[in-house]
Amino acid sequence: MQTLASFQEKVDESLTLFRRKYPSFEEAYSSYTAQYGGDSVQVHEPFRISETIDPVIIVLGRTTLLFYRDSQRTLNGSLSSIEIRKGVLYILGRREPLDSRLIVWSKESESEVERFDSRVRIVPSRIHAVILGGENGDVLFDDLGSSSGSILAGETKKPEPFITLYATPRVGIHRVELKSKYGQ
């Protein structure tokens, strides 16, 4: 698995490339870092979404849904699907000014993958998350310190269910434990 330092290095290289290649990315990145600071785009704790049973549900900004399908290595939204390729890094975010479209930028393309309702209080961040298609076949997800957070829900092939929450400390978490109907 990638070390945090090597993952951050790949993110930094991609930020530089995407800023030169895509005017929409440059505008999103510049306005985001002007608001939150130059070091606001950081790797935190990558989570492996490969070796999972389809789909892994990815929620960005509370209401924007994407689906990762490991059997096809695709990230799916209502507008398009992106094949996650080995060795390619993808940054998820939105344009500035706000146009209600979630974008995936990579060295290969800029793609609109999902719509979101800009009337909600919490929308995806301009620079929100990263997905890395690792050289070894792993697919890693990480929230890049977005102000609106991310949720992953799915099941590994073991099978073992998981829910991962990337959020600021101010976000309240309400967990209701249910009595298990099956063996411990």
Regions flagged by a language model, labelled:
Residues 102, 110, 127-175:
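Forkhead-associated
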